[in-house]
Amino acid sequence: MYNLTFSPSLSSSLLSFTQQTPAAIVSSSPPDLVLQQKLRFVVETSPDRWAYVIFWQKMFDDQSDRSYLVWVDGHFCGNKNNNSQENYTTNSIECELMMDGGDDLELFYAASFYGEDRSPRKEVSDESLVWLTGPDELRFSNYERAKEAGFHGVHTLVSIPINNGIIELGSSESIIQNRNFINRVKSIFGSGKTTKHTNQTGSYPKPAVSDHSKSGNQQFGSERKRRRKLETTRVAAATKEKHHPAVLSHVEAEKQRREKLNHRFYALRAIVPKVSRMDKASLLSDAVSYIESLKSKIDDLETEIKKMKMTETDKLDNSSSNTSPSSVEYQVNQKPSKSNRGSDLEVQVKIVGEEAIIRVQTENVNHPTSALMSALMEMDCRVQHANASRLSQVMVQDVVVLVPEGLRSEDRLRTTLVRTLSL
């Protein structure tokens, strides 16, 4: 096992390419190609469309007594069928992400060679082949770099072990495992004489620069300009960080902000049940849809609760209008007392199982609500639901209570309640 570490030695790797045309590369002998040509040869002659290829070299640090992988060289092809630009113009969420981070796939590739503290690390085995296809395999992989790759739009991530490191390839398309392709990559890099580096002091190696003439076709000219622009930007940033600590502090703050934002995206992705794609824009869109569906469910539940309450009230009104032995209205002329003097009391009781529905109608004098609650407490009846409404000078109270076993008779409960309220 060894650490996947990223080397700042970008200047050499960015310039290590030649002006040889793809046709000439195909017809030439792969073992004779220099490292950059080999990387281009692998992706340009493959029937599948790979977005990038990276050569990670195995290194050993005597100080920590550990082996790790370090960036040596790479080649970025991009997504030829990428139609994300159209999506960015039609979706406000994706436009915002585009302005903030640019092309996720290219940013993921560029982050590999910026600096060791700006990219994720993961211990991997130099003898194991990794071929992950589809968002689910990348998302649930134990390979941390695979999760990060899937989050940046990679749908296929391949890590092929060779003699002194690994060859990593990524694509935005789903590519099934191809044994012939794996063997061809191993033969190209296993038989080549790639410069071997040692790192006994813990410093990063610098790959050899291949010579090339100033004349060449336009296909490699645009690649040269893009690579030189990236290198110039990196060198300028490194110089400013060295001479201006304030800039370094700002860069560190920006790095922490992006890490915090990524962690929040990870948390959001964990709670959203269905994610259509692994990029940030799709994740936000899926999260919005999920929240809207939850709001719709809440509205439906609230509507059902209102209907149930209305149905319960209608049943109670119907039961009070029917005269039966189990539902008799008692008109009690209470004696003048301290609690309720000169008021008419009307009590209706309906028992259903262990619960009873009680309606008490009385004059709105001497705090009838408190009197009813006190009476129920004395009777050891637990109140489940209570509702009180005033109509002119009449107070109507509807109460649902749990009835103790000794009072689970409508006549007995009604008589006991009337007697308790009359005291």
Curated annotation (Swiss-Prot):
Comp. bias regions, Polar residues: 328-342
Cellular component terms per the entry's GO annotation: cytoplasm; nucleus
Region (Disordered) residue spans: 192-243, 312-343
Pfam families: bHLH-MYC_N (PF14215), HLH (PF00010)
bHLH domain sequence ranges: 245-294
The entry's keywords: DNA-binding, Nucleus, Transcription, Transcription regulation
GO molecular function: DNA binding; DNA-binding transcription factor activity; protein dimerization activity
Major site of localization recorded for this protein: nucleus
Statement: the UniProt record of this protein carries the keyword Transcription regulation: yes
Biased composition (Low complexity): 318-327
One GO biological process term: negative regulation of gene expression
Localization terms from the record: Nucleus
Subunit structure: Homodimer.
Protein name: Transcription factor bHLH14
Annotated organism of origin: Arabidopsis thaliana (Mouse-ear cress)
